[in-house]
Amino acid sequence: MPDFVCKVAATGVTVSLGHQLAKSPKDIEDCIVAGAKAFTHLGNGIPNEVNRHDNIVYTALVEDRASVMFIPDGHHLPDTMLKLYARAVPLKRLVAVSDAQYPAGLPPGEYEVCGAHARLEPNGLLWNPARNCLVGATTPIAKCMRILEERIGLTPDECRAIGHDNALALIDKR
């Protein structure tokens, strides 16, 4: 995997690690050294049960060379996890994303999303009832910022950094 990361990073693409099953923190370390700059959707895209000490979440929280991207939509992560990220990770390394996709902005109902059946609930939860799992997100980034402000206690300036400035810096646009 580090060879692949190195080749992709050499093209100027920002490489982010996520929705993966690294076998060890060493595998993650090798990818960071090879050019990976972030962790995608930290806390999601991993098995429901992971090793309680040796897992990507802990590794990402202490890896100073990579940003931590997360989805603060009120569905993907509990408030306790959002608070942990806000307290454990330096502000400059945090990047909030909405991950909003089809059917964002549409009324509650049944939809086909990336080939999977999905139900969009009135509260914005997009999930597959048969598999009891999330199928994506529909919450706009502005609402994600309100969640971080109102439920986690971040300031408007911190939210702007996490929801805008840090993302631009991550892709070298700031």
Region locations from a protein language model:
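Active-site core of PLP-dependent enzymes with the aminotransferase class I/II
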Residues: 1-7
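Active-site-adjacent C-terminal substructures of enzyme catalytic domains
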Residues: 4, 17, 25-158
